[in-house]
């Protein structure tokens, strides 16, 4: 029996057996399991399993097994239990087990002190809707970026050839396979989160695309009299509509006789919510999303350096609190309406400031072997925009470096805001990994912002972010 097979078997047993597992997803280092009955889970046994680096007791039980094997363990658990398996993000790293273990120990301690509120539940719902789509966002965004680069080279005359134009066309078709039908994917995932039938959620998402509607035969906005536009209201409207759908469907399941439930319930649900979506939700959500996009672009455009500093400095605490997920639908709305999100490159500076702080700790605390071992695993992935090991394993537990990292993020954000017009064409990772997604060839500006954040985090941490105990541990 391989290590992965043993881990999967032992974890499944500690979770109360295969019958107690509802569904499984995994991120870069964790297997996240939704169980039917939490009382059947033996947490002591789960934590004692050889190969389990940590356990986070949350709405979804998070079992930390480390990078590289997490996808194998998750798949084996799904095969053994028959549970559905979805993938959040994937990673193929081989060195940072100590950093991951330290990070999740502190993360568990931090999360255990937080009171679960309705707001936290809303944030978890938003996260569960969009996290499974992150690989698709990244892949489609990068493909679109390649197509844009080739198109620019064609326009400039640097390259030529009909076959290159065909490649650009094909790449854009692949990209649009994700971005054009995002409302459908959002509807399906929203239905899963809200406990509705996924297919019905997808139909409601597809309804917002107004397929078949032409200028000669439009649907009018009942509030303004103007033609209703395809996708109006964006994913904000889709999420709200599917939430209503879930309540209607659940109610109908209770009152419709079993003999006709399979026919009557989906028909009535789709008809009712479909009409409500087209005539009420789309116009109102469109008003909200348009206003949101306008306000954010105005704040970034008018505020410039000041707005950039505030966003860059305060985004890391939002990540720490789990509040950063609320920005995902905002990024998507910005991209849908303007072609790029100016918010993401500024927010990405928070992670860069933390990298600068980590480099300063490496230089300043050379005698702290434990800290250096943690940094060996956490720092390389920090450059690529994966900041959790640094947050929970290094800066947050130490205290001071977390605040100096925030200042570094503010410095980078101020530079990005000062340069202006630096946007990202897709939602993706931060750090160096975001570079291919930068819009309008503003790559140099983004690099300058990154370097400024690195420098800011380094300088403030080097001079103000360490203590004698950090530098010379006993």
UniProtKB/Swiss-Prot annotation:
Enzyme class, spelled out: transferase
Keyword Ribosomal protein: no
Annotated PTS EIIC type-1 domain residues: 124-474
Domain PTS EIIB type-1: 5-87
Pathway the protein takes part in: Cell wall biogenesis; peptidoglycan recycling
InterPro entries: Glu_permease_IIB (IPR036878), PTrfase_EIIB_Cys (IPR018113), PTS_EIIC (IPR003352), PTS_EIIC_1 (IPR013013), PTS_IIB_1 (IPR001996), PTS_Sugar-Specific_Components (IPR050558)
Annotated TM spans: 129-149, 167-187, 193-213, 228-248, 268-288, 299-319, 343-363, 378-398, 402-422, 444-464
Gene Ontology CC terms, in alphabetical order: plasma membrane
Alphabetical list of Pfam families matching this protein: PTS_EIIB, PTS_EIIC
Superkingdom to which the source organism belongs: Bacteria
Disulfide bonds: none
Single GO molecular function: protein-N(PI)-phosphohistidine-sugar phosphotransferase activity
Biological process according to GO: peptidoglycan turnover; phosphoenolpyruvate-dependent sugar phosphotransferase system
Enzymatic reactions: N-acetyl-beta-D-muramate-(1->4)-N-acetyl-D-glucosamine(out) + N(pros)-phospho-L-histidyl-[protein] = 6-phospho-N-acetyl-beta-D-muramate-(1->4)-N-acetyl-D-glucosamine(in) + L-histidyl-[protein]
Localization (cell): Cell membrane
Keywords from the UniProt entry: Cell membrane, Kinase, Membrane, Phosphotransferase system, Sugar transport, Transferase, Transmembrane, Transmembrane helix, Transport
Membrane topology: Multi-pass membrane protein
Catalytic residues (positions): 27 (phosphocysteine intermediate)
E.C. numbers: 2.7.1.-
Record remark on domains: The EIIB domain is phosphorylated by phospho-EIIA on a cysteinyl or histidyl residue, depending on the transported sugar. Then, it transfers the phosphoryl group to the sugar substrate concomitantly with the sugar uptake processed by the EIIC domain. The EIIC domain forms the PTS system translocation channel and contains the specific substrate-binding site.
PANTHER family, A to Z: PHOSPHOTRANSFERASE SYSTEM TRANSPORT PROTEIN, PTS SYSTEM N-ACETYLMURAMIC ACID-SPECIFIC EIIBC COMPONENT
Protein task: The phosphoenolpyruvate-dependent sugar phosphotransferase system (sugar PTS), a major carbohydrate active transport system, catalyzes the phosphorylation of incoming sugar substrates concomitantly with their translocation across the cell membrane. This system is involved in the uptake and phosphorylation of MurNAc-GlcNAc, the principle peptidoglycan turnover product of S.aureus, yielding cytoplasmic MurNAc 6P-GlcNAc.
Name assigned to this protein: PTS system MurNAc-GlcNAc-specific EIIBC component
Organism this protein belongs to: Staphylococcus epidermidis (strain ATCC 35984 / DSM 28319 / BCRC 17069 / CCUG 31568 / BM 3577 / RP62A)
Organism placement in taxonomy: Bacteria, Bacillati, Bacillota, Bacilli, Bacillales
């Amino acid at each position: 029996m391989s290590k992965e097979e043993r881990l999967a078997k032992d974890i499944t047993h500690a979770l109360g057996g295969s019958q107690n597992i509802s569904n499984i997803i995994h991120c870069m280092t964790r297997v996240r399991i939704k169980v039917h009955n939490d009382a059947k889970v033996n947490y002591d046994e789960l934590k004692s399993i050889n190969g389990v680096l940590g356990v986070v007791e949350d709405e979804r039980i998070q079992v930390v097994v480390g990078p590289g094997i997490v996808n194998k363990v998750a798949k084996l658990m799904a095969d053994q239990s028959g549970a559905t398996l979805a993938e959040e993000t994937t990673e193929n790293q081989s060195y940072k087990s100590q950093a991951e273990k330290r990070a999740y120990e502190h993360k568990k301690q931090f999360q255990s002190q937080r009171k679960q509120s309705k707001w936290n539940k809303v944030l978890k719902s938003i996260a569960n809707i969009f996290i499974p789509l992150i690989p698709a966002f990244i892949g489609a965004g990068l493909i679109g970026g390649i197509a844009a680069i080739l198109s620019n080279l064609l326009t400039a005359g640097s390259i030529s050839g009909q076959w290159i134009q065909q490649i650009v066309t094909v790449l854009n078709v692949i990209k649009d396979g994700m971005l054009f039908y995002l409302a459908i994917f959002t509807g399906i995932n929203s239905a899963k989160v809200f406990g509705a039938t996924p297919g019905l959620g997808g139909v409601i998402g597809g309804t917002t695309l107004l397929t078949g509607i032409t200028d000669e035969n439009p649907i009018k906005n009942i509030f303004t009299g103007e033609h209703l536009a395809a996708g109006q209201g964006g994913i904000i409207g889709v999420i709200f509509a599917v939430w209503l759908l879930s309540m209607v469907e659940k109610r109908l399941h209770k009152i419709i006789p079993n003999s006709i439930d399979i026919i009557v319930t989906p028909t009535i649900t789709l008809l009712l919510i479909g009409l409500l979506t087209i005539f009420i939700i789309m116009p109102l959500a469109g008003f909200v999303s348009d206003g949101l996009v306008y306000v954010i672009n105005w704040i970034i455009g008018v505020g410039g350096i000041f707005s950039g500093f505030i966003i860059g400095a305060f985004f890391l605490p939002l990540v720490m609190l789990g509040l950063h997920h609320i920005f995902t639908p905002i990024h998507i709305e910005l991209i849908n309406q303007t072609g790029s999100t100016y918010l993401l490159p500024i927010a990405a500076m928070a992670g860069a400031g933390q990298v600068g702080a980590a480099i300063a700790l490496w230089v300043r605390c050379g005698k702290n072997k434990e800290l250096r071992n943690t940094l060996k695993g956490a720092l390389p992935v920090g450059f690529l925009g994966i900041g959790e090991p640094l947050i929970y394993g290094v800066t947050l537990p130490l205290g001071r470096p977390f605040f100096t990292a925030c200042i570094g993020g503010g410095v980078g954000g101020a530079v990005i805001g000062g340069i202006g017009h630096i946007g990202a064409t897709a939602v993706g990772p931060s750090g160096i990994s975001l570079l291919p997604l930068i819009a309008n060839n503003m790559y140099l500006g983004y690099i300058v912002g990154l370097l400024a954040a690195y420098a800011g985090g380094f300088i403030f941490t080097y001079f103000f972010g360490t203590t004698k105990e950090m530098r010379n541990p006993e």
